[in-house]
Amino acid sequence: MTTSSLPILIVICGATATGKSSLALQLAEKFNSVILSADSRQIYREFNIGTAKPSLEECQRIPHYLIDICDPQDNFTLAQYQEQAEDLINNLHYSPLFLVGGTGLYIKSIVKGLKIPRVSPQADLRRQLQALGQSYLYQILTQVDEEAAKKIHPHDQVRTLRALEVFYLTGKPISSQQGENPPTYPILQIGLDCSPESLGKRITVRTDQMIARGLVAEVQNLGDKYGWDLPLLQTLGYAEIKQYLLGEISLEQAIDLIILHTRQFAKRQRTWFRADADIIWFPVDKENLLESVEREIILFLEGLSRPDIKTHHPD
């Protein structure tokens, strides 16, 4: 396969509320392309407002892929995401393609070519493990796979369960089954960043907008339809409104908690992405941000056509 026939991938990443989706939409229009989502909650149908899912109008402007691909009660693994994303990257006839989102592991699975254990979720095993409680599960993980435990937060039940699930079904630690096999096609990673103060203001505005758009009604409908124990209703934005709807806290308290938890989440995202030296960063408050990023992409594409310039390839 020649370089000219390879797909070209432009990644737009960064913390939540930095304007990734808006910028990507404008860039996709300028380059006559499409957008692949890298968001672990936008894959679920009916979870719209709280996940800041692209609107119908935005999807009509530019085709979006990897959103609304499974039902709220479905288990969707990183391996499934990687498989579907790679299939799209290799078969969509657009150049470049835009991969956009804030789920670092989704992006890393593509950019670094993570080797992921192909172990299907086992509902019965997960129920048995969950009954033991997250604290005890994490203790078990530290004993059977210390390397994985170092990379998983003690309160991250989803990844803890997955690591233990792989261990019990294969007899091998998940950390020993992981590795990297970077793709051969060219990749440019663009990161959006801003100061904590500016990001805090953006998060407050974004939260207020979600409430105004009907987040409370969305959560109520989801709880009524799927039950309040639905795992997705324990995630950011939904968990806090759920507490309000169940009479545990006031709406004002719920909004304050969403803002607080989103800021904490954004800080973790920023730390994750900052660890990748291949990302080229742009401040979101920069004048002419769109033009600056567009120019960076054009220079990258021009470089690919020149044999004297080395094609970008993840380490």
UniProtKB/Swiss-Prot annotation:
Molecular-function annotations in GO: ATP binding; tRNA dimethylallyltransferase activity
Sites marked Interaction with substrate tRNA: 103
Alphabetical keyword list: ATP-binding, Magnesium, Nucleotide-binding, Transferase, tRNA processing
Annotated binding of substrate, by residue: 16-21
Record field: catalytic activity: adenosine(37) in tRNA + dimethylallyl diphosphate = N(6)-dimethylallyladenosine(37) in tRNA + diphosphate
Signal peptide: none
Gene Ontology process terms (BP): tRNA modification
Gene3D superfamilies: 1.10.20.140, P-loop containing nucleotide triphosphate hydrolases
Location of the region described as Interaction with substrate tRNA in the Swiss-Prot/TrEMBL record: 39-42
Enzyme Commission number(s) of this protein: 2.5.1.75
tRNA processing as UniProt keyword: yes
A Pfam family per the record: IPPT
Cofactor: Mg(2+)
This protein's record includes keyword ATP-binding: yes
InterPro entries named in the record: Dimethylallyltransferase, IPT, P-loop_NTPase
Binding site for ATP: 14-21
Classification via SUPFAM superfamilies: P-loop containing nucleoside triphosphate hydrolases
Primary enzyme class: transferase
Entry function: Catalyzes the transfer of a dimethylallyl group onto the adenine at position 37 in tRNAs that read codons beginning with uridine, leading to the formation of N6-(dimethylallyl)adenosine (i(6)A).
Quaternary structure and partners: Monomer.
UniProt protein name: tRNA dimethylallyltransferase
Gene: miaA
